[in-house]
Amino acid sequence: MPAINKTKGSADRIKMKIRKGDTVQVISGKDKGKTGEVLKTLPYENRVLVQGINQRTKHVKPSQEGETGRIETKEFSLHASNVMIYSTKEKVASKVEIFVDKDGSKKRRLKKTGELID
């Protein structure tokens, strides 16, 4: 696997239509059908971190005397192609369309419902 160049403005950065704070639905994998909010986007790896999705458990040993071991659950990232933006009003997942508004600003909207995202 080639190394990922994480410098700003590099050609390896992938333009994603998903942003932090969007509500998304998982369309494939073990959590298929679940919805959650995007906590973080990783554009150089084309991955997203979604709240409550793709959780893994880790058993942590005690590091000091008198401390007990614990089990931690943590969200891991998903590939951006495995999620779609979810409309909470219409209860449907849809592709995203970027268009230029009358005032010249770029906006995002859902293709199925026409709902504006931002």
Curated annotation (Swiss-Prot):
Keywords: Ribonucleoprotein, Ribosomal protein, RNA-binding, rRNA-binding
InterPro entries from the UniProt entry: KOW (IPR005824), Rib_uL2_dom2 (IPR014722), Ribosomal_uL24 (IPR003256), Ribosomal_uL24_CS (IPR005825), Ribosomal_uL24_KOW (IPR041988), Translation_prot_SH3-like_sf (IPR008991)
Entry-linked Pfam families: KOW, ribosomal_L24
Annotated GO CC locations: ribonucleoprotein complex; ribosome
GO molecular function ontology, one term from the record: structural constituent of ribosome
Origin superkingdom: Bacteria
Gene Ontology annotations of biological process type: translation
UniProt function note: One of two assembly initiator proteins, it binds directly to the 5'-end of the 23S rRNA, where it nucleates assembly of the 50S subunit.
NCBIfam families: rplX_bact
Family per similarity comment: Belongs to the universal ribosomal protein uL24 family.
Subunit-structure text: Part of the 50S ribosomal subunit.
Protein name per its UniProtKB record: Large ribosomal subunit protein uL24
Species this chain originates from: Prochlorococcus marinus (strain NATL2A)
